[in-house]
A protein has these predicted regions:
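Long, low-complexity intrinsically disordered regions enriched in Ser/Thr, Asp/Glu, Pro/Gly
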Residues: 9, 20-22
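Positively charged n-region of N-terminal signal peptides that target proteins for export
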Residues: 1-4
């Protein structure tokens, strides 16, 4: 009997461990901000350790307003889009380069449940190479351009369908 209970306990523990990484991100849409996001992507969970955008590894040609060249990283959540779009907690980090391939800025899309439903619930942030906040929140310059891709959850690079 003791062996059966011990076996059941082991199965339960293993099952719970398997679910730990699948929690839905519950960032508060009222308090999300660029300073905390920078700490997250530069220290706590460095974006440079994320995967490249699927099928696009390394620096590629860019265009305005992002720069002559870009390099795009995505966290694990952003690697799992569905027909409904990207899951909450998705982070898309784009390095924007000048023609001489000097890093000019970083532009971020962060999907936060309830943040801005009219614009796909994306929180937008722009940083200088040193982390200086150049813009954040419901940035109309970002929303205006990306709204033409509402059918792809406001994401340009490649279709997730």
């Amino acid at each position: 009997m003791h062996k059966i209970l011990l076996s059941l306990l082991m199965v339960l523990i293993i099952s719970l461990c398997g679910c730990a990484g699948k929690e839905e991100v519950t960032e508060d849409p009222e308090t999300v901000n660029a300073a905390d996001l920078w700490k997250r992507i530069s220290q706590d969970d460095p974006y440079t350790e994320y995967a490249f955008w699927p099928g696009v590894e390394g620096i590629m040609d860019g265009n305005a307003p992002h720069g002559a060249f870009i390099q795009t990283f995505v966290n694990d959540k952003a690697l799992e889009p569905t027909e409904a779009g990207y899951p909450y907690g998705s982070l898309i980090v784009k390095e924007n380069y000048m023609p001489d391939k000097t890093l000019a800025k970083l532009t971020i899309m962060y999907k936060v449940k309830g943040y801005d439903p009219q614009s796909g619930d994306w929180f937008w942030a722009v940083y200088g190479p040193d982390g200086t906040i150049e813009g954040e929140g419901r940035m109309q310059s970002c929303i205006g351009c990306h709204s033409v891709r509402a059918d792809q959850d406001h994401v340009f690079l490649k279709s997730y369908r």
